[in-house]
């Protein structure tokens, strides 16, 4: 649907909501002292999750003059030799801002130039109206340096069921799954069946 294709055997991890996916991705990628760029306003758990794994959160405030979209200039100004990960969420909560393909292509150039990894929280992707949602992971050379997070809470109004999806390179998903299996084991069976019904129902 969003031009993303992953091997379900080793490139997809089912999590207890996208929130667990955020935590797992950060813990798999971030070493103590690494800087993580966080686009704000942001989901409440982003910065605490960065801090819990020893990372240093660096805020990138979105500007109304840019329609709350992240620009390549804003991103470039925050990058240092310690920067490792860019954490973004578009469509954004609470601004509702979306990143169009041209916006993401400009961000892609900066990410590649500085060898960054991207965690992209796309939980609101299904709530994009009037235009097709574009994932930065679908752009050339970005597949191998992105973890895409999504879930069922927003698209299917299943907040309490705690069902999330993390998709990315097999090596990263492998390390995320190692943490997942010793902390959570698995998402609830009943929730998985409910999610399957949501995905396959003709309604």
Task: Map each language-model feature to its residues.
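Substrate-binding/gating loop at the entrance of the active-site cleft, primarily
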Residues: 16-20, 24-27, 37-55, 64
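Conserved core segment of the aminotransferase class I/II
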Residues: 139, 144-203
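Hydrophobic residues at beta-strand termini and immediately following loops
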Residues: 15, 60, 136, 149
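Active-site phosphate-binding strand-loop segment of PLP-dependent enzymes
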Residues: 58, 62-130
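Phosphate-binding glycine-rich loop
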Residues: 1-35
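A short helix->loop->beta-strand "cap" motif at the edges of active sites that frequently abuts
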Residues: 34, 55, 113-117, 142-144
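Short, intrinsically disordered, charge-balanced linker/junction segments flanking boundaries
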Residues: 1-5, 78, 82, 198-203
């Amino acid at each position: 649907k969003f031009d993303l294709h992953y091997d379900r055997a080793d490139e997809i991890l089912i999590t207890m909501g996208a929130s667990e996916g955020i935590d797992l991705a950060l813990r798999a990628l971030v070493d103590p002292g690494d800087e993580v760029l966080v686009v704000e306003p942001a989901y409440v758990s982003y910065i605490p999750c960065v801090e819990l794994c020893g990372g240093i959160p660096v805020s990138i405030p979105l500007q109304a003059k840019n329609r709350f979209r992240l620009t390549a200039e804003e991103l470039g100004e925050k990058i240092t030799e310690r920067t490792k990960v860019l954490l973004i969420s578009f469509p954004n909560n609470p601004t509702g801002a979306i990143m169009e393909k041209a916006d993401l292509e400009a961000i892609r150039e900066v990410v590649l130039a500085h060898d960054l990894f991207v965690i992209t929280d796309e939980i609101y992707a299904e709530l994009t109206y009037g235009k097709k949602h574009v994932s930065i992971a679908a752009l050339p050379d970005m597949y191998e340096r992105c973890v895409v997070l999504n879930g069922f809470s927003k698209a299917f109004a299943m907040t309490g069921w705690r069902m999330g999806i993390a998709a990315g390179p097999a090596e990263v998903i492998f390390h995320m799954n190692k943490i997942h299996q010793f902390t959570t084991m698995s998402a609830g069976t009943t929730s998985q069946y409910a999610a399957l019904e949501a995905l396959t129902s003709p309604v």
